[in-house]
Amino acid sequence: MFLAAGFLALASVGCGKRHSAKKLVENFIDEHAQLSSVSITDVGKLDSTDRVDNSTINALQADVKNGGLYKPDTKFGQRPANTKTLLMIRVTLETKDEKGEKKPYKQTFYLDPELTSVVAVKTN
């Protein structure tokens, strides 16, 4: 019984972090998307990585600013100096162009470990 309660508690913590990550991504999209009709259609699991170095982060940030989906003045958070680890979540977005045609995007959002900012975005 205690074991089941422990698993339930761990699952709720994980779901809470995933929900916080999703909300952070939604807020980022709302603030920085150039198109007025961008919606999230699917959200993957929250995971972590230590394989994204600072030069990759800089390149991903530049790609986003020049890619057309987000505003050129998009602001990103910074990776904390005391860790190489970032959280990551894969998201499927849907946009509509001026003709009303839907276009899907699959993106990976890299987040700081405290879930306070988006550090980089990669279009898959």
Give the residues covered by each predicted segment.
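Sec-dependent bacterial lipoprotein signal peptides
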Residues: 1-15
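Cystatin/cathelin-like cysteine-protease inhibitor module
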Residues: 15-124
